[in-house]
């Protein structure tokens, strides 16, 4: 099956604003820092120093935190905050508080904390960028050593956020230029784009966040081994799993389920030749899988994006929100992709074949191997071996019935069932021609004499369905279970014994 996907939302790891509140007992009460971390464990996994100081803002900056949450919609809010945005909010509350200008605060909420909802898909985010940028210009905050600053590069505007991680914020139309600036500073970034992707005269009304990648490893357990999958694929797989949970919840009608992505290729840019040479076998396999899973048809406004879903994986998924459930689903999804898209791993219960050769699995952690091509070669060799084994099995089996038939001169083979059907037809014809009173002798033995003095039996039968040899020369029928060939002295199997006549006629 396929589900639609859009380009109008971020692929970032997010949590809902409502998660800051006690959802079980009192929704107007902010939870403690320990409860918040426990209930949203996935966003803190492999996060390094992103969230240092979280406990302090839940204790010492609680009033400022309340103001931000109220602006974001409070306990009933549908908005979400990204992983990087939460990190920036912690740093902001450690040093600053909200402005008296409501417009500036609204811009801070979106540009710095990356709190967003579906309303941003309709546009207006570039205006928020301009509001905050002009405010920083008025305050002459152009020093990148500060938490918030502004700058220009090749006449393109950007906002620089220097927190526990670094984020460049710019209009989507300027993203490539600002990414060039980040690369010149050795900042390896990933992009999240939020806003409307409908093009107008000034470009798309969307804002791009270029955040420096984490130094920590993002790992997954695959086929009993641990591999580093990197932050980008970790984010992508999280979005995939969350979307597939929606498919599982709406298994009878998944037409309304959509995956929100931000590029034609999905969430991770496809590897070029240089990237493939540097990537591990697992990353190359995931890159190959993306080319299969993330489909695009058409161009411009007619472009249709979709994501391929396998029903056999939906049946394997666990439904839940806990950290362990999410991690387990991510691990299962990677294994599923390796089997179905790359032919690596153990054969799936749905019948999809794969190769789990140990040397092939070792290549997943190594660089410089085209693991997908190697898997195809291994699968081809497996198929050849299976065909060879089938041929050997055929040669070792018993010879066919046709090959075991021995026919003498003037003889032809006829199966017992075919012979009986012909016999019944001939018997019916003969009975119709005879008188109503039958000869008792003929009842036990029905023999015709040809002009040459030979005798032909009209009702040769054999109980077993292995067939009999019907000789066109003389044949005597002694009873319904015994066939005796006078010319060849050959007789068929019998269940009723030999008659005395047969015993006297049998050759030595």
Swiss-Prot record:
Polar residues: bias regions: 424-453
User: Residue spans with biased composition (Basic and acidic residues)?
Assistant: 455-464
Ranges for region Disordered: 424-464
* Protein's name in the database: Non-structural protein 1
Species of provenance: Banna virus (BAV)
Q: Which gene encodes it?
A: Segment-5
């Amino acid at each position: 099956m396929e589900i639609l996907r859009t380009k109008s939302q971020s692929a970032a790891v997010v949590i809902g604003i409502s998660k800051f509140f006690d959802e079980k007992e009192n929704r107007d009460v902010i939870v403690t820092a320990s409860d918040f971390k426990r209930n949203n464990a996935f966003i803190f996994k492999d996060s390094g120093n992103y969230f240092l100081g979280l406990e302090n803002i839940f204790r010492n900056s609680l009033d400022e935190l309340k103001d931000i949450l109220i602006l974001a919609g409070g306990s009933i809010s549908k908005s979400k905050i990204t992983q990087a945005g939460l990190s920036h909010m912690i740093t902001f509350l450690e040093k600053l508080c909200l402005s008296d200008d409501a417009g500036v605060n609204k811009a801070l909420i979106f540009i710095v904390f990356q709190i967003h909802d579906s309303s941003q898909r309709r546009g207006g985010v570039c205006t928020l960028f301009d509001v905050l940028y002009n405010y920083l210009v008025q305050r002459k905050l152009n020093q990148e050593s500060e938490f918030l600053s502004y700058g220009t590069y090749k006449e393109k505007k950007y906002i620089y956020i220097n927190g526990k991680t670094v984020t460049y914020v710019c209009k989507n139309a300027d993203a490539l230029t600002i990414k060039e600036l980040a690369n010149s500073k050795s900042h390896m970034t990933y992009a999240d784009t939020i806003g409307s992707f409908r093009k107008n005269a000034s470009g798309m009304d969307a804002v791009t966040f270029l955040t420096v990648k984490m130094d920590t490893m993002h790992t997954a357990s695959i086929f009993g081994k641990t591999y580093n999958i990197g932050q980008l694929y970790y984010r992508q797989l999280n979005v995939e799993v969350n979307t597939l949970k929606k498919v599982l919840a709406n298994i009878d009608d998944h037409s309304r389920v959509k995956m929100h992505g931000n590029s034609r290729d999905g969430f991770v840019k496809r590897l070029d030749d240089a990237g493939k040479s540097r990537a591990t076998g697992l990353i190359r396999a995931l890159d190959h899988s993306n080319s299969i899973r993330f489909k695009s048809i058409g161009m411009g406004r007619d472009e249709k994006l979709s994501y391929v879903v396998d029903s056999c994986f939906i049946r394997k998924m666990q439904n839940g929100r806990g950290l362990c459930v999410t991690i387990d689903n991510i691990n299962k999804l990677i294994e599923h992709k390796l089997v179905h898209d790359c032919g690596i791993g153990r054969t799936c219960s749905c019948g999809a074949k794969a190769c789990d050769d140990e040397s092939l699995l070792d290549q997943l952690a190594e660089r410089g191997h085209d693991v997908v091509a190697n898997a195809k070669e291994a699968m081809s060799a497996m198929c050849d071996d299976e065909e060879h084994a089938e041929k050997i099995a055929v040669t070792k089996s018993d010879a066919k019935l046709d090959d075991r038939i021995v026919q003498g001169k003037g003889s032809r083979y006829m199966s017992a069932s075919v012979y009986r059907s012909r016999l019944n037809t001939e018997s019916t014809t003969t009975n119709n021609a005879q008188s109503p009173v039958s000869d008792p002798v003929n009842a036990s033995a029905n023999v015709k004499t040809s002009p040459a003095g030979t005798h032909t039996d009209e009702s040769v039968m054999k109980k077993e369905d292995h067939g009999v040899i019907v000789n066109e020369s003389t044949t005597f029928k002694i009873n319904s279970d015994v066939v005796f060939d006078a010319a060849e002295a050959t007789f068929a199997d019998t269940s009723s014994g030999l008659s005395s006549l047969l015993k006297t006629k049998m050759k030595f």
